[in-house]
Amino acid sequence: MRVLLVLDHPYTLASAENVPHRRSFTAAVAAAAVRGAAAAGHEVDVIDLAADGFSPVMTREDLVAWRRGAVVDPLVGDYQRRLLAADHLVFAFPVWWEAMPAATKGFLDRVLTKGVVFAERPGARGNPFRNLMPRLGGVTVLSVMTTPDKAYRWWYHDPLTKILFKGTFGKIGVRNLRWVNFDRVTGRTPEQRRRLLDATERRFAALAPGRGGDPARKGPLARRGPLTRSGT
């Protein structure tokens, strides 16, 4: 099975190592997911948005090219090819201002384009969108935040799942959507961090083949991930 992981953090995947002032717990979680999936024999492809220098801005040239069935930015075309080849998609990012960082939103805007990853059927009854990613069997979101999980769900009303699941992948017909949230990141101990990373690795080692697997059900953690380490 081919797993595509999209990491969005300015420090890049290199910050997975626990080096003061150059570390990111988001990157450490992403690296643990990669290790687990690879240990299970899955092919793992990593898109490191910051390392690639990906721009989240949809330009006028992008829109003109899209209307002509073309792509201006070769990086966008490369991401689209890799997405179409994926059986399971994983996003890993910190939560800023209660939402994903700009590069992840730009990935949705510029890469998940109509005519490439989904089609729209004018006049269709019900949902007019059709999934053009037949291999993609599931999406897992790994989010890291300082906000308490309960506050995020009940006070802010879960904006991440509304945007990514209900408003994006669910809308175009992708099933098996899973969210793993690591809250209160700055208040966790080194032992809690280690346990969290070990559990994340086991979760993705248990990723089941066929229709994109289901790491949230197969792994050792529940829907939320309460154990984290300092630094988003």
PLM regions: where:
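A short, flexible beta-alpha/helix-coil linker loop
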Residues: 9-13, 145-150, 184-187
